[in-house]
Amino acid sequence: MSEPFHPVSWSFNTNIYEVNLRQYTPEGSFTAFQYELPRLKEMGIETLWFMPVTPISILKRQGTLGSYYACSDYTSTNQEFGSLQQFKQLVEAAHALDMKVIIDWVANHTGWDHSWTIEHPDYYRRNWEGQFYDGNGWEDVIDLDYDNPAVRDAMIEAMKFWVEECEIDGFRCDMAMLVPLDFWVRVRTELDQIKKLFWLAECEEVSYHQVFDATYTWSFLHKMEAFWKNSTGISGLEEVLHRYGSAFPATAFHLFFTTNHDENSHSGSEFERLGDAAMALAVLCCTWKGLPLIYSGQELPNKKRLKFFDKDPIEWNGKYGLHDFFRKLLFLRKSNTALSAGTGTEIHRIPTNADDNIFAFLRRKGQAEVVVILNLSHNPQPFIQLKDQSFYGCFTDIFTGSETSFSPTSHLNLSPWQYAVYEKL
């Protein structure tokens, strides 16, 4: 049995930002986005995840520009975004700011006119009529055949290209569970010989943590949506969070988010789906044990559904209304070891006199402590008492800068959907 993989050191306190390059600027280019790097760095972003930068198939394309996830060539860039050299310059600029770059990788399928369909038709699965097909109902892509060893070899070489040529820092692997686990074991083993990378899987399968550092929290996202629609209470949220802590390896990272490209385009913005709870739940996603994901435009906040297959730029207004909100949360994650992912940190819910409406919890590592208190209700909570003597002492409210002392006699007031985050002095 091979030795277990270990996360790169910088990943434990990193903050991830998903870049929808097409919609980010009017130009939708690598060069235009590069000008945004200092602002994102100042907001606390550490890692940039770029949706696929590869060319998009024309055959059976959806919309005018097509899906990022219908690749026509694994080792070149989408010329709408810019040249390979311009992408390299973007990576270099990010690295100069001590930021990391990971790219989206679509290993399960390609677009219908990928070069392999002509050069290596044996790389693809066939239906009963002998035709290329996709087994998931996606009309613009066709499935690769991982029973063919040549597919595995070619895919690994393509992934090596981006590490060696562009010096990227990791991969976000699209629908990773559709690709055999033993392939991912091999690819990480080989790529680790070139550079230690960060591996994020778009899946929630426990077994994939044999390879991947982090996986998605789709179950929690859907539970948050159900919570807002009044079909579940706080206990429903806590149940899913508990499962992440008990059913997964202690070393597993979980990616928490209130929105991403799929949710925004197909289901609506976080404000459509989570309503007044959106901000408090964003605090939860940034402070629970795991890694936070911020999607393009959340700092505005962007409240419109961005088109997925057509040009539909984010409507930046220069105000970045939630910049400071995220900056305070993300810099706390960067600086306070209590909010680290992985092992070695303690997390537990703090009982209160209003547990049906208040979700309070403690994060601790050594002497570092962070207390998070969320009013997850439509009602004001005027006299909240925290019934846990293990953390009593002096803390600073990260949003207001005011100091407070928690003791058996102290209490606090929270308006509907209000949140508070305290760092121990």
Describe the predicted segments one by one.
Residues 29-32, 82-86, 150-155, 179, ...:
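Soluble or luminal CAZymes and related metallo-dependent hydrolases
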Residues 164, 174-254, 284, 303-332, ...:
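Active-site-proximal helices and loops of the catalytic beta/alpha 8
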Residues 56-61, 109-114, 179-182, 207-210, ...:
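Short catalytic/ligand-binding loop motif for oxyanion handling, primarily in non-cytosolic enzymes
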Residues 3-15, 22-28, 37-46, 52-166, ...:
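Substrate-binding/active-site clefts of carbohydrate-active enzymes
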Residues 22-24, 53, 106-108, 176-178, ...:
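Active-site beta-loop-alpha junctions enriched in small/polar residues
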Residues 15-17, 48-50, 101-103, 171, ...:
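Hydrophobic faces of well-ordered beta-strands that scaffold small-molecule active sites
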Residues 250-272:
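Active-site clefts of carbohydrate-active enzymes
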Residues 1-49, 55, 88-93, 238, ...:
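Carbohydrate-interacting/catalytic domains
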